[in-house]
């Protein structure tokens, strides 16, 4: 370890420490990139007067080595966390074994080091604990369902990275009249859960949260009018077709119809109505039919849905009911190349036309149309093209992107315990097994669950039985498989939340139970935060007809769970 007198902090750190010494109040922690270098004859310390009392109670500096942390510096109760803690992992990714590749020291100060220094020479105030908790809980909600129709609770949580958040979600129950065996009419439920991961703005995802269930329900109603027993049968093409039609009809209205109206009258209202066509969004919609206990998952894009339960031997298993639809999915690559023969650049660097990562999405007009009714979009008046975006390179034979979903079905039995839906930001941070294990641990503490078989401080073993695991992008952010710390001092999870979706988000940010990671990643403001994490949206639904507390008295009620819900604050 270098002597303290040979450690030089960069100028921004000096300025912040100077402010701290001035007596002004600041938040508890400060995130800053710092560098250590040989500086034997420097007059730096005496000139700044910062480190004269470096061994006093006012200021202590410590260098800690580890696979993830490069440096910690402590200034009285104020904390300085090196930005290398996060940047080293982000910038240097992981190797094939999953280990972290950290940059090697460069004492000569090469151009590469100088470039990295200039790019990362920025500071972020770390929020205090109460503000971090407020952010984590700001967008959480939980509901008890006492309808006796197969789902007894669902939790939702979000953590923005973009400002405003580009994700959205929907939870809705639609009742359908069913004729029972004795000829009586009874009501059964269709549960809809949706997550919409937007990009290029919040407009498309917001539109989907309001309209997608309505469009799908209308198409299902058309099928039901022709066949009253359609919801009794096992998975069938009629329901799948209705869901697909709802998706495609909404996307057609978003893109084609909005631009058609813009050609007819380029007024401000019609210009604004094209915003959901200009931005884009993935869509993940789950439909649980309480009549036959069939769960259908429709995915457009790269959000993911998991179901978890016990197999016949009592082992926990997790299964993905969706496959990530990106330019890295070989099935999607083959489909798109077949639709656009003779276009070698249709998939470039794992992206559609070298730009868009999801291969299916709502909106994203610039990957779908050049003209409407034979009229080129370039013919619109300039004022109508205010929000237009540049046409991609090699844009020859649109559409290159579709909103048509891929639909899968699963029978929900008594051993299927819960479903987790998440935007891709969650799966960048956690594996399918980790997500299922974290929910099981949460259930062990918060529900009447049989004791979980796992070592103290460890997550229970879960087997991933997904059919197409190779097509799913693995979790890659902040993964460190070299940790040798005992579970007691370095636990693999945190369990602090009453809302299980918030519990998943907290642990996704913790890099294996490290609270300092949660603090850092929650504190980084937008837009800088997008370098380190995406918007996070999570929904967890619990299957079964038990587990609802006595707070629910009405036999058909849906009741807010107050201890796991943060009521929205009035916005001026």
Swiss-Prot record:
One Gene Ontology cellular component: mitochondrial intermembrane space
Cited CDD domains: PP2Cc
Origin: domain of life: Eukaryota
Composition skew (Low complexity), residue ranges: 481-491
GO biological process terms on file: signal transduction
Keywords for this protein: Hydrolase, Magnesium, Manganese, Metal-binding, Mitochondrion, Protein phosphatase, Transit peptide
Gene Ontology terms, MF aspect: [pyruvate dehydrogenase (acetyl-transferring)]-phosphatase activity; metal ion binding; protein serine/threonine phosphatase activity
Record: residues binding Mn(2+) 2: 197, 424, 480
Cofactor section: Mg(2+); Mn(2+)
SUPFAM superfamilies reported in the protein's UniProt record: PP2C-like (SSF81606)
Basic and acidic residues compositional bias, start-end: 470-480
Something else known: Present with 7550 molecules/cell in log phase SD medium.
Recorded family membership: Belongs to the PP2C family.
The name this protein goes by in its record: [Pyruvate dehydrogenase [acetyl-transferring]]-phosphatase 1, mitochondrial
UniProt source species: Saccharomyces cerevisiae (strain ATCC 204508 / S288c)
Gene name in the database record: PTC5
